[in-house]
């Protein structure tokens, strides 16, 4: 019987950070939980980052994942927004790293390709495939659905890497 691996996907953002937890065993996927962390826009940047860090740390402690998958940041025309997203992403990398989890990073196009089969697709397509692959999945936001897609992407790439290691050993 295959070992069960618990994966948390994290879709970082300063306003909202989505998270999704799945269990992965052999070729079986099971939804565990998903949600969205929000920071208080009335607070200063440092306080907002602390809110995200505490929220992620609490989720990691509650669900005890074995591995984390975090979305790569993308650069847009608004440099300030990109910097803030980068800072939120640093929290998304730091919290699982401090919990001694291996952290894997995936570009948005790689996540889309893993979940819907093409690198450029609408959010609705991703959300529909998350529901197909995880029929019991419940998510309260687009960010939580994207986080589940990240966890699914990691389960796919983890399987490929494991299979490759076995056949080349």
Swiss-Prot record:
This is Crossover junction endodeoxyribonuclease RuvC. Gene3D superfamilies: Ribonuclease H-like superfamily/Ribonuclease H (3.30.420.10). Transmembrane segments: none annotated. One of its GO terms (biological process) is DNA repair. Homodimer which binds Holliday junction (HJ) DNA. The HJ becomes 2-fold symmetrical on binding to RuvC with unstacked arms; it has a different conformation from HJ DNA in complex with RuvA. In the full resolvosome a probable DNA-RuvA(4)-RuvB(12)-RuvC(2) complex forms which resolves the HJ. Binds 2 Mg(2+) ion per subunit. InterPro entries: RNaseH-like_sf (IPR012337), RNaseH_sf (IPR036397), X-over_junc_endoDNase_Mg_BS (IPR020563), X-over_junc_endoDNase_RuvC (IPR002176). It comes from Bartonella quintana (strain Toulouse). It catalyses: Endonucleolytic cleavage at a junction such as a reciprocal single-stranded crossover between two homologous DNA duplexes (Holliday junction).
């Amino acid at each position: 019987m295959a070992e069960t691996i618990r994966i948390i996907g994290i879709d970082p953002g300063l306003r909202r950070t989505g998270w999704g937890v799945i269990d992965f065993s052999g070729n079986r996927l099971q939804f565990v939980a998903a949600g969205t962390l929000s920071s208080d826009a009335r607070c200063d940047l440092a306080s907002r980052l602390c809110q995200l860090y505490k929220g992620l740390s609490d989720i990691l402690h509650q669900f005890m994942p074995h591995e984390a998958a975090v979305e790569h940041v993308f650069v847009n025309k608004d440099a300030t927004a990109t910097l803030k997203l980068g800072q939120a992403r640093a929290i998304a990398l730091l919290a699982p790293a401090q919990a001694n989890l291996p952290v894997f990073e995936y570009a948005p196009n790689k996540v889309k390709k893993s979940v819907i089969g093409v690198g450029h697709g609408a959010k609705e397509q991703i959300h529909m495939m998350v529901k197909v692959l995880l029929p019991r999945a419940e998510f309260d936001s687009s960010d939580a659905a994207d986080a589940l897609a990240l966890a699914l992407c990691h389960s796919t790439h983890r399987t490929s890497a494991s299979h490759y290691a076995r056949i080349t050993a």
